[in-house]
């Protein structure tokens, strides 16, 4: 699984614009035409991506994360961000036009691409078939984000 964190998101984590303990963090399911897996420069808001390629299956909706945790991992010398519950996209119609490639995590501001702030793109280890009626991103298996000593 590969992740891409926009440079602006790194700055926003440091300056407090994105607070992983208190911000409303959401997940957006994206399909295989996304550019979220390659773009990290000059991505300040969601509308700065060339193509997000949001899931287009009937019944699709972004998911608000719940049970977010930020912990210091002294054993592995890093900080971890995760959720205590899986991220589950339910009620999908099984009729998307392309397979699912990953999730785009973002800070919800007002529900518009012009103002919502990207956090990270998390790629699945393999594409999920477009016929899926539910997509589950497991929690606490690899952590959603990790900050390590350089």
Predicted features, each with a name:
Residues 1-101, 108-150:
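Small cysteine-rich, disulfide-bonded extracellular modules of the LU/uPAR three-finger superfamily
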